[in-house]
């Protein structure tokens, strides 16, 4: 994705958040959920996450116990040491990263732990899941920094 495209979606996102919110509250949820996988595929034909990595720079995934176990093992760390080194408990008592950007994000926007990354990272930005429609607050938050979310929302709005 070119730099001008990144700037364009950021501008559109800020302008359209209110419109997206109204749309997500009125949408035919069942119909939208059925077409999300196609829109997801189309969006990721245009968008390369490595051009952006805004999710890794602005967002912390939740680290479930299975994630912690898997990642700690891959780093040859004890689970508790991994937690103490990288994680904190948030207001919902979920483990999240202590800092942003993600400490596993490399300079070229690749992930050091990609093969064992947390399930939230694997699923992000949820554009092919019912969560995208059923949790509009999450979708709107993600729209503030993810071009794929904006792309899927724009295409959904065209279909109605």
Locate each region found by the language model.
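Short loop/turn segments that flank or connect secondary-structure elements
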Residues: 1-160
């Amino acid at each position: 994705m070119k730099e001008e495209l990144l700037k364009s979606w950021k501008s559109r996102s800020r302008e359209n958040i209110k419109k997206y919110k109204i749309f997500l509250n009125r949408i035919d949820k069942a119909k939208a959920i059925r077409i999300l996988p196609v829109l997801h595929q189309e969006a990721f034909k245009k968008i390369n996450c490595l051009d952006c990595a805004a999710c890794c720079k602005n967002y912390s995934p939740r680290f479930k116990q299975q994630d912690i176990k898997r990642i700690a093992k891959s780093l040859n760390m004890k689970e508790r040491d991994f937690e103490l080194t990288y994680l904190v408990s948030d207001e919902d008592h979920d483990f999240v990263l202590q800092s942003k950007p993600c400490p596993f994000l490399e300079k070229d926007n690749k992930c050091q732990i990609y093969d064992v990354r947390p399930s939230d990272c694997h699923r992000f930005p949820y554009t092919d899941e019912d969560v995208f429609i059923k949790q509009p607050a999450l979708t709107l938050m993600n729209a503030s920094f993810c071009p794929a979310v904006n792309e899927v929302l724009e295409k959904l709005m065209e279909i109605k």
